[in-house]
């Protein structure tokens, strides 16, 4: 069954990779009120994919890592240049392995490059299963957990696109597997070093991966709180290994940007991004968090496509009517709430994973206090523990194993996937040509 879920993820992600436009200009389905012209878009495909592919292309052409310059006249093309290097090095190598045109300009080139992330997506499915088993969940619960990253439309779309997100999800999930194993069974040298390597590689994938070190810190604290000998030094060793792996890149950033995470250059470059303060002034603080951030992050957890402008339904529930999103979210929330009641509060591994997930949510809220970026993919570094929580909840509801849990999660995941088959290709097609004038 696990192999079936992995194969299903690969097949569905390939479909997203095939139907999503690559490096393609188009039009938003809206009119600029000032110019009375339809809004043009530099890219209509996957979020930031144009810029990620530019990073890979420049790396292949020059053999050097790019530098983010806030005054770059082509900043729109290059605003991902501050990102850590691991994904782009792997993508450049993958490009050569698959004999992709170095220009990376055609849809076929994009499809080849996207397939690398499909592999990473499959690894995330496997790691979610392993995480559930590491916290002593049953085989059936572990398979339920793996269903979520395997079939969740938004995760499938990310696996079928070019970015550093799927590699980040895979590395953080596998690091959490090691953390759960160490906290539950004891930290041997191999587990500690493996966790450290995974944390370091995650930090070399995306700056937000710094949160994985919080999981290691919580694991170290758990060893003292629960007074378990042999479970204290392992996380500290892992932290040391991870920091040693990431340190060269951070030192390089100190020389280039003046800070290890290139935050100064990032802040200067993203000044034109929609500011939270402006949105709050426009609609009010409560409405901002509930109707904008809350609504958009809830819907995009299931799936919103293109540049957050292609919904699974015609309105995305913005008209207040019951939509496919509400059904899916209801099933997932019921599972999560039931999971909170099932998980033992004295389980060290559960507490560590819960604190890590809370850290991801806090960082997300902090980010949206400055920028309006209500995209649930920023929560996906915690997708594996969230999936385990939901699966544990539905397993407790269906304790007699009558199939209710499988049925509920199948509805929550396959119903929106069916809507994606219907609406996503049409949504991209609409944006390829300008709207006809009346």
Give short role names for the model-derived ranges.
Residues 302-350, 407:
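Hydrophobic, aromatic-rich transmembrane alpha-helices
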Residues 111-136, 174, 338:
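Transmembrane-helix motifs of polytopic, lipid-linked glycan transferases
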Residues 101-107, 128-151, 169-170:
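Transmembrane-helix signature of polytopic, membrane-embedded enzymes
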Residues 143-144, 344-366:
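Transmembrane alpha-helix segments characteristic
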Residues 1-36, 125, 224-225, 233-241, ...:
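Start-transfer (signal-anchor) and selected internal transmembrane alpha helices
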Residues 135-136, 175-194, 202, 224:
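Membrane-interface transmembrane helices that cradle and orient dolichyl/undecaprenyl
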Residues 181, 212-243, 250:
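Perimembrane helix-loop-helix junctions
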Residues 191-207, 213, 241-244:
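Membrane-interface alpha helices of multi-pass inner-membrane proteins
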């Amino acid at each position: 069954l696990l192999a079936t879920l992995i194969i299903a993820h690969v097949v569905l992600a390939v479909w997203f990779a095939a139907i999503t436009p690559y490096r393609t200009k188009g039009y938003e389905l809206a009119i600029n009120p000032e110019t009375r012209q339809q809004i043009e878009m530099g890219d209509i495909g996957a979020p930031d994919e144009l810029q990620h592919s530019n990073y890979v292309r420049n790396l292949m052409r020059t053999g050097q890592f790019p530098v983010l310059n806030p005054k770059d006249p082509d900043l729109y093309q290059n605003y991902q240049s501050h990102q850590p290097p691991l994904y782009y090095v792997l993508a450049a190598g993958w490009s050569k392995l698959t004999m992709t045109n170095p220009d990376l300009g055609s849809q076929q080139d994009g499809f080849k490059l996207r397939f690398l992330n499909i592999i990473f997506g499959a690894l995330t499915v496997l790691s979610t299963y392993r995480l559930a088993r590491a916290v002593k969940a049953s085989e059936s619960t572990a398979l339920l957990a793996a269903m979520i990253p395997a079939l969740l439309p938004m995760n499938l779309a990310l696996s079928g696109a070019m970015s550093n997100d799927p590699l980040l999800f895979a590395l953080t999930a596998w690091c959490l597997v090691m953390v759960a194993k160490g906290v539950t069974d004891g930290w041997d040298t191999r587990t500690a070093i493996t966790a450290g390597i995974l944390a370091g590689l995650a930090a070399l994938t995306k700056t937000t991966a710094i949160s994985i070190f919080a999981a290691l810190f919580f694991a170290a604290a758990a060893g003292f709180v629960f007074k378990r000998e042999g479970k204290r030094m392992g996380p500290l060793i892992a932290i040391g290994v991870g920091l040693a792996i990431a340190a060269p890149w951070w030192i390089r950033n100190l020389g280039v940007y003046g800070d290890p995470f290139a935050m100064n250059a990032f802040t200067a470059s993203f000044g034109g991004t929609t500011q939270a303060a402006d949105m709050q002034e426009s609609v009010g603080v409560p409405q901002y968090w509930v109707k904008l951030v809350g609504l958009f992050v809830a819907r995009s957890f299931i799936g919103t496509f293109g540049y957050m402008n292609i919904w699974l339904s015609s309105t995305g529930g913005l008209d207040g009517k019951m939509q496919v999103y509400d059904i899916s979210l209801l099933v997932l929330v019921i599972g999560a709430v039931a999971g909170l009641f099932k998980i033992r509060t004295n389980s060290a591994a559960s507490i560590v994973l819960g604190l890590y997930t809370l850290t991801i949510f806090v960082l997300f809220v902090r980010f949206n206090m400055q920028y309006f970026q209500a995209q649930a993919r920023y929560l996906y570094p915690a997708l594996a523990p969230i999936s385990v929580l939901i699966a544990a909840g539905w397993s407790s509801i269906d304790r007699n194993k009558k199939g209710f849990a499988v049925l509920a999660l199948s509805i929550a995941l396959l119903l929106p996937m069916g809507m994606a088959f219907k609406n996503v290709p049409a949504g991209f097609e609409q944006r390829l040509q300008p709207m006809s004038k009346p």
